[in-house]
Amino acid sequence: MSLSNKLPVTDVDLKGKRVLIRVDFNVPLDENKNVTNPQRIVGALPTIKYAIDNGAKAVVLMSHLGRPDGKVNPKYSLKPVVPVLEKLLGKSVTFAEDCVGPQTEETVNKASDGQVILLENLRFHAEEEGSSKDAEGKKVKADKADVDAFRKGLTALGDVYVNDAFGTAHRAHSSMVGVDLPQKAAGFLVKKELEYFAKALESPARPFLAILGGAKVSDKIQLIDNLLPKVNSLIITGGMAFTFKKTLENVKIGNSLFDEAGSKIVGEIVEKAKKYNVEIVLPVDYVTADKFSADATVGAATDATGIPDGYMGLDVGPESVKLYQKTIAEAKTILWNGPPGVFELKPFASATEATLDAAVKAAESGSIVIIGGGDTATVAAKYKVEDKISHVSTGGGASLELLEGKELPGVAALSSK
């Protein structure tokens, strides 16, 4: 699956067309149904505005919100998004009480002059995800004929399909892969994701560094496997570094995370790194704690001293940070997935802050820095540096699967240029 040859929305004539856009409006709501963080709505604005400005007859937005499990549940209605979207767009938005059916088709077909229509939650229908849950919480597969009918129902609402929901691109859901229109284009968000991941995975400026954190080696094995033939260096940090240190160098790790299953593959990873001439950088010192808490007794340890029993490593220490800074400064492409420490707790956030500073410096001096979703994206948001990094991915699971070398159904379904 080539990432760089997908049809962008800018190559499609939208004049007079009904433009059906899959957005990601899966936003958090408080108990009064107010949107508490509109970031995902803001993210979709460039694509929505582009369709309006380029003469679309109707701009039809479809999304999921939460996990209603294939049944109508007012708690997960997309209606609270309407006032937020109206304010951001500066124009009225029509809400359709269902995402398919004759009434919805009538609303869409009557629209003119770029009228924006937001459809109700796709996941109120079991046919979106392909299954629902019964009263006992067991999965019930949706009937194939019903799924086909639902997909036809969505297809009937547009002349052109645009996907701007990268966060759901790894799911083969009906709204991602089942809309059967001649032109299926990438919106601006998806286009940016694909461009940056193509830069890293298909034609990186070298040296190419990957920084991988996370708890378990076994969770990241596919990722490491797919990246080793592509990168020049690899920083292994976070909880999974302890499995490497104990297995390779017999460092005493106290009560730190140890991944028994992962430890069996550490040797293979090191051999493969040698084969591809990849330098693996591991931490050499640690910030320790007697419990997983902000008010823990904090200590320091090195490889030589080891971490004493009763203590665990929750961050890497200043010497490790220096190693990371040097490696980051030498790289031209940096892909970062997983923080070095438990940044949510203040005493164990300093290596994450220092790594982030180094990444920002690298981006400012012209390197391409990509943050791959999930916890690391949370870090970038927490320290308000998203605009200082070349690209912060919006899709945790989707970016991880892409980096693991998997094909994303939502991307594969798009037309080629």
From Swiss-Prot:
Protein name: Phosphoglycerate kinase
Purpose of the protein: Catalyzes one of the two ATP producing reactions in the glycolytic pathway via the reversible conversion of 1,3-diphosphoglycerate to 3-phosphoglycerate. Both L- and D- forms of purine and pyrimidine nucleotides can be used as substrates, but the activity is much lower on pyrimidines. Negatively regulates the biosynthesis of acetyl-CoA from pyruvate in the mitochondrion.
CDD domains, sorted: Phosphoglycerate_kinase
Species classification: Eukaryota, Fungi, Dikarya, Ascomycota, Pezizomycotina
Superkingdom per UniProt: Eukaryota
Coiled coil ranges: none
Residue sites binding Mg(2+) per the record: A215, D219, D375
Needed cofactors: Mg(2+)
Pfam families referenced in this protein's UniProt entry, alphabetically: PGK
Positions contributing to AMP binding: A215, K216, K220, G239, G313, E344
Assembly behavior: Monomer.
Sites where the protein binds CDP: G214, D219, G238, G338, F343
